[in-house]
Amino acid sequence: MIAVITTLLTYYMSSNNLITLLIAIEILLLTVTLKLIHISGYYDDIYGTIFSLIIIILAGAESAIGLSILVAYYRLRGTIGHSI
């Protein structure tokens, strides 16, 4: 719950910066993954840990793709801001 509130607060405080929005989404995904690791360790379940590892790998690929899209957007427009 705290991760969702923190992510929404970060988005509200910097709503015109796409890089900060990408970082806020990654923090939310990492928080959910860490909670999944904690729960799978509590119940002694290996599948939750494996699933968490897959989520972390996919999050790394997602952030690399998102950052490359932002770099291409910056080269095209000259700014990284957006408007709601």
Swiss-Prot record:
UniProt cross-references to Gene3D superfamilies, sorted A to Z: 1.10.287.3510
Protein's GO biological process: mitochondrial electron transport, NADH to ubiquinone
TM regions (residue ranges): 19-39, 50-70
Swiss-Prot/TrEMBL keywords: Electron transport, Membrane, Mitochondrion, NAD, Respiratory chain, Translocase, Transmembrane, Transmembrane helix, Transport, Ubiquinone
Main location group: mitochondrion
GO MF annotations, alphabetized: NADH dehydrogenase (ubiquinone) activity
UniProt keyword Nucleotidyltransferase, yes or no: no
GO cellular component entries: mitochondrial membrane; respiratory chain complex I
Membrane topology listed for this record: Multi-pass membrane protein
Family the UniProt entry places it in: Belongs to the complex I subunit 4L family.
Protein's name in the database: NADH-ubiquinone oxidoreductase chain 4L
Annotated organism of origin: Candida albicans (strain SC5314 / ATCC MYA-2876)
Organism lineage string: Eukaryota, Fungi, Dikarya, Ascomycota, Saccharomycotina
Gene of this entry: NAD4L
